[in-house]
Amino acid sequence: MHDLAVKWCVHIKMSETLLLLFLFALKHGVCDLALQAIYCRPSHKHIFLSPRAMMHSLHHGVGAWIVLIPFTNYLTAITFAVLDGVSHHLIDYSKSSIVRKKNWSLDGKMYWVATTVDQNLHFSVYFLIVYFVMIF
Protein backbone atom coordinates (compact mmCIF):
# COMPACT_ATOMS: atom_id res chain seq x y z
CA MET A 1 0.00 0.00 0.00
CA HIS A 2 2.87 2.35 0.83
CA ASP A 3 4.37 1.90 -2.67
CA LEU A 4 1.04 2.78 -4.26
CA ALA A 5 0.76 5.94 -2.17
CA VAL A 6 4.30 6.97 -3.11
CA LYS A 7 3.61 6.34 -6.81
CA TRP A 8 0.39 8.36 -6.58
CA CYS A 9 2.19 11.29 -4.92
CA VAL A 10 4.94 11.20 -7.55
CA HIS A 11 2.32 11.07 -10.31
CA ILE A 12 0.48 14.09 -8.90
CA LYS A 13 3.70 16.08 -8.50
CA MET A 14 4.77 15.17 -12.04
CA SER A 15 1.34 16.18 -13.39
CA GLU A 16 1.56 19.54 -11.62
CA THR A 17 5.07 20.08 -12.97
CA LEU A 18 4.05 19.29 -16.54
CA LEU A 19 0.97 21.49 -16.25
CA LEU A 20 3.06 24.40 -14.97
CA LEU A 21 5.58 23.96 -17.80
CA PHE A 22 2.71 23.86 -20.31
CA LEU A 23 1.21 27.04 -18.84
CA PHE A 24 4.57 28.78 -19.09
CA ALA A 25 4.77 27.75 -22.77
CA LEU A 26 1.28 29.19 -23.37
CA LYS A 27 2.20 32.36 -21.47
CA HIS A 28 5.32 32.71 -23.58
CA GLY A 29 3.37 32.37 -26.82
CA VAL A 30 0.75 34.92 -25.79
CA CYS A 31 3.29 37.45 -24.50
CA ASP A 32 6.05 36.96 -27.07
CA LEU A 33 3.78 36.83 -30.10
CA ALA A 34 0.27 38.24 -29.67
CA LEU A 35 0.76 40.92 -27.00
CA GLN A 36 4.11 42.00 -28.41
CA ALA A 37 2.64 42.36 -31.90
CA ILE A 38 -0.35 44.35 -30.64
CA TYR A 39 1.24 46.63 -28.03
CA CYS A 40 5.01 46.64 -28.40
CA ARG A 41 5.92 47.29 -32.03
CA PRO A 42 8.40 48.64 -32.79
CA SER A 43 9.96 47.69 -29.47
CA HIS A 44 13.49 49.08 -29.89
CA LYS A 45 14.73 46.32 -27.57
CA HIS A 46 18.33 47.33 -28.31
CA ILE A 47 17.65 50.46 -26.20
CA PHE A 48 17.85 49.26 -22.60
CA LEU A 49 15.00 51.38 -21.20
CA SER A 50 12.80 51.47 -24.29
CA PRO A 51 9.20 51.92 -23.04
CA ARG A 52 7.82 49.28 -25.41
CA ALA A 53 10.55 46.80 -24.51
CA MET A 54 9.80 47.45 -20.84
CA MET A 55 6.08 46.90 -21.50
CA HIS A 56 6.91 43.62 -23.24
CA SER A 57 8.89 42.48 -20.19
CA LEU A 58 6.04 43.59 -17.92
CA HIS A 59 3.65 41.41 -19.94
CA HIS A 60 5.93 38.45 -19.26
CA GLY A 61 6.18 39.24 -15.55
CA VAL A 62 2.42 39.63 -15.11
CA GLY A 63 1.83 36.52 -17.19
CA ALA A 64 4.24 34.56 -15.01
CA TRP A 65 2.43 35.75 -11.88
CA ILE A 66 -0.92 34.63 -13.33
CA VAL A 67 0.56 31.22 -14.18
CA LEU A 68 2.29 30.79 -10.81
CA ILE A 69 -0.33 31.95 -8.31
CA PRO A 70 -2.38 28.70 -8.38
CA PHE A 71 0.79 26.70 -7.63
CA THR A 72 2.48 28.65 -4.87
CA ASN A 73 2.11 31.45 -2.34
CA TYR A 74 1.83 35.13 -3.22
CA LEU A 75 5.41 36.09 -2.32
CA THR A 76 6.97 33.22 -4.26
CA ALA A 77 4.77 33.99 -7.27
CA ILE A 78 5.75 37.68 -7.19
CA THR A 79 9.44 36.84 -6.75
CA PHE A 80 9.56 34.48 -9.72
CA ALA A 81 7.34 36.77 -11.81
CA VAL A 82 9.83 39.60 -11.29
CA LEU A 83 12.67 37.21 -12.12
CA ASP A 84 10.87 36.23 -15.33
CA GLY A 85 10.22 39.83 -16.38
CA VAL A 86 13.75 41.02 -15.62
CA SER A 87 15.44 38.01 -17.22
CA HIS A 88 13.20 38.36 -20.26
CA HIS A 89 14.23 41.98 -20.64
CA LEU A 90 17.95 41.19 -20.28
CA ILE A 91 17.80 38.29 -22.74
CA ASP A 92 15.87 40.32 -25.33
CA TYR A 93 18.13 43.35 -24.89
CA SER A 94 21.24 41.21 -25.32
CA LYS A 95 19.93 39.50 -28.45
CA SER A 96 18.66 42.73 -30.00
CA SER A 97 21.90 44.57 -29.27
CA ILE A 98 24.00 41.82 -30.85
CA VAL A 99 21.70 41.54 -33.89
CA ARG A 100 21.82 45.32 -34.39
CA LYS A 101 25.59 45.58 -33.85
CA LYS A 102 26.26 42.72 -36.29
CA ASN A 103 23.61 44.04 -38.71
CA TRP A 104 21.93 40.64 -38.96
CA SER A 105 18.63 40.68 -40.87
CA LEU A 106 15.49 38.55 -40.67
CA ASP A 107 16.47 36.72 -43.85
CA GLY A 108 19.97 35.90 -42.61
CA LYS A 109 21.03 32.69 -40.89
CA MET A 110 22.70 34.37 -37.92
CA TYR A 111 19.52 36.25 -36.98
CA TRP A 112 17.76 32.91 -36.60
CA VAL A 113 20.67 31.42 -34.65
CA ALA A 114 20.43 34.40 -32.27
CA THR A 115 16.66 33.95 -32.03
CA THR A 116 17.13 30.25 -31.25
CA VAL A 117 19.54 31.10 -28.43
CA ASP A 118 17.11 33.78 -27.19
CA GLN A 119 14.16 31.38 -27.08
CA ASN A 120 16.19 28.60 -25.45
CA LEU A 121 17.32 31.00 -22.74
CA HIS A 122 13.72 32.05 -22.05
CA PHE A 123 12.61 28.44 -21.72
CA SER A 124 15.62 27.63 -19.54
CA VAL A 125 14.41 30.34 -17.15
CA TYR A 126 10.95 28.74 -17.14
CA PHE A 127 12.41 25.32 -16.34
CA LEU A 128 14.39 26.79 -13.45
CA ILE A 129 11.34 28.63 -12.11
CA VAL A 130 9.21 25.48 -12.30
CA TYR A 131 11.95 23.44 -10.65
CA PHE A 132 12.25 25.80 -7.70
CA VAL A 133 8.49 26.23 -7.31
CA MET A 134 8.00 22.47 -7.29
CA ILE A 135 10.73 21.68 -4.75
CA PHE A 136 9.44 24.24 -2.24
Where are these regions (language model features)?
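Hydrophobic alpha-helical transmembrane segments
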Residues: H2-F136
